[in-house]
Amino acid sequence: GGLGIRYQAEEPPLPHDYATAIRDKLADRGLEILIEPGRAIAGNAGILVTRVEYLKQQPEKRFAVVDAAMNDLLRPTLYNAWQNIVPVQPRDDADMHRYDVVGPVCESGDWLGRDRDLAILPGDLLAVRSAGAYGFTMSSNYNSRPRVAEIMVDGDTTHLVRARETLTDLWRGEQVLPA
């Protein structure tokens, strides 16, 4: 539910237009209407930055294996959602190829994007766009992977909002059974 956001060519309604349409239909019923805005508030405000670990060529497909995984951004796997993926620094010294952008957790569902035309090399940073809504709240520690840091960017200033988890964070609260 809630208002959607633009991932590709979608045209979700503007909040004002959406509210007006609902009010016009339901105003005479005397109802209290509560609306969950969904991704409209934060969806396009967040980007997941990931590094290309290596490029893998199979007979029928190319893979860009990155250091982020489905546990960091579940929407592509869970909803077959499209997230625009672009190089942080475009380059002209790499050939353009079509890649599936996949994570390192060795699951068939561990992908962030399929069939993406990218000119990339190992070590490049990729921006997975529109990752602001529910990215962290849907993330997990699957395969004992610490969750990513969250950084707020305000103009030229950055602020650490949430530190990257450590393995110690993952073990916190666990107890060893008595001998």
Describe these PLM feature segments:
Residues G1-R6, P37-R39:
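Glycine-rich beta-strand-to-loop/alpha-helix junction loops that act as flexible
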Residues I5-E10, T137:
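A generic structural signal for short coil/turn motifs at secondary-structure boundaries
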Residues P13-L14:
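Conserved N-terminal phosphate-binding loop of PLP-dependent enzymes in the Aspartate aminotransferase
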Residues Y18-G30:
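Alpha-helix-loop-beta-strand connector modules within alpha/beta enzyme cores
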Residues G30-A179:
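Charged (often Lys/Glu-rich) extended helix/loop segments that serve as interaction or gating elements
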